[in-house]
A protein has these predicted regions:
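Conserved hydrolase catalytic core segment
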Residues: 134-176
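Short beta-strand/loop motif that positions the catalytic acidic residue
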Residues: 288, 294-296, 300
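Alpha/beta-hydrolase
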Residues: 192-283, 290
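Conserved alpha/beta-hydrolase
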Residues: 84-102
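A catalytic-pocket lid/entrance helix-loop region that shapes and gates access to the active site
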Residues: 159-206
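Conserved acidic catalytic loop of the alpha/beta-hydrolase fold
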Residues: 115-135
């Protein structure tokens, strides 16, 4: 039985990989691009995936979350976001300490935020030179949104606009709200052992990595990440796992590191986590020079929605919008993901109408839950 299951797994994995490579070959032969590159950023060889139907389209760089977790929006996302890649040349990056980059450099996890930011600036310079453009779009997800907003603040002349997905604003404040919510959640559902564990751990902040890891383990047993519908999670986590296991650019060891190994080691050994815990965009960034757009789940208890709204209300920007998704928590539901990608595509099309397609029946205005001018 074990041999049958193992054999079936490898057959399915090979079929998925062949499908992705076939689509990549088609793009590469019809004026587009789909490939993985090794680039030297800082002192380290790192990995990016580039995909798009037309290389004349604007460049969009994704900054994944974690820290140390390149899912979603690392190189395993190749062939996954066709709504975006039809309109942009999309770049996915496995950052220092994450995914394939971690697998190639497993001993180098004692890095700092400053190193990751320097890597990002080098990568943006590389992309601008490679595609002969002055500016690119930047898309930050979860912890990657801290890096994204700081880049917006520091190098606005190199960016068209910024999209913050599940935007981090003030981790300490969000974590304190999250702690209280977890207590209420576990008490109301009768999980008394988890209530006891939380109280024993105490309220954040957690200075020790071991305490933060314990809090994360407790958090993983809650509904803070995912909104549930009719007793089922409203996020296809299995699809994310399949995406990594089927990725033709990852060995099985690299797939394991992408899903588990890299984030675990990064949390234990790098300074990155403690540095991110000290972020306070409320005080740090009060004005930006480019348009900024944010999308968040209405039930995101990891990154406080009310905190995001308060910050954006005060933020000075040429244009700013907040899209609140009714069917999502920190992770976006399948239907809300589709809304986000169409929203991003429509906003980019306003600046690059040459790539615009026939409009959908649903307009951007109809899907905005909240609009801030």
């Amino acid at each position: 039985m074990i041999f049958l299951i193992s054999g079936g797994f490898f057959v399915m994995r090979q079929l998925f990989r062949q499908s992705i490579l076939s689509s990549a070959n088609e793009l590469n032969h019809t004026g587009g691009i789909s490939e993985v590159r090794e680039v030297l950023l800082g002192d380290m060889l790192q990995y990016i995936a580039i995909e798009g139907e037309n290389m004349d389209n604007p460049v969009c760089l994704f900054l994944h979350g974690g820290p140390g977790l390149s899912l979603p929006y690392g190189i395993s996302s190749r062939h996954q976001l066709e709504t975006i890649s039809s309109h942009c040349t999309v770049v996915y990056w496995d950052q220092r300490g994450a995914g394939k980059t971690y697998s190639t450099n497993p001993s180098d996890v004692s890095f700092t935020y400053e190193q990751v930011e320097a890597d990002a600036k080098e990568l943006i310079t590389y992309l601008r030179r490679e595609f002969e453009v002055d500016q690119i779009y930047l898309i930050g997800y979860s912890w990657g949104s801290v890096l994204g907003m700081r880049l917006v603040h520091e190098i606005p002349e190199q960016l068209y606009a910024y999209f913050g997905l599940s935007q981090v604003v003030h981790p300490l404040q969000s974590e304190q709200v999250l702690y209280d919510w977890l207590l209420d959640e576990f008490e109301s559902t009768g999980h008394h052992q988890l209530v006891s564990s939380l109280k024993q751990l105490g309220q954040p902040p957690y200075e020790q990595a071991s305490s933060q890891e314990t809090f994360q383990q407790i958090l993983n047993q809650s509904n803070a990440y995912v909104k549930w519908r009719e007793g089922l999670p409203n996020v296809n986590v299995l699809n994310w796992i399949r995406q990594v296991l089927a990725c033709p650019d990852l060995t099985l060891k690299e797939a394991y590191d992408t899903l588990i190994g890299a984030s675990h080691q990064t949390l234990k050994q790098s300074q990155y986590w403690s540095q991110l815990q000290a972020v306070n965009l409320l005080e740090e960034i009060k004005e930006v020079k480019i348009p900024v757009y944010f999308a968040t789940g209405v039930d995101d208890y990891i990154c406080s929605v009310s905190l995001l709204q308060s910050w954006v209300e005060q933020l000075q920007a040429p244009k700013k919008e907040v899209l609140i998704l009714d069917n999502s928590a920190h992770y976006f539901s399948n239907e809300d993901e589709s809304i986000i990608y169409q929203w991003m595509k429509d906003l980019i099309a306003k600046k690059f109408p040459q790539a615009e397609e026939a409009p959908d029946e649903t307009t951007v205005g109809e899907i905005f839950s909240n609009l801030l001018q």
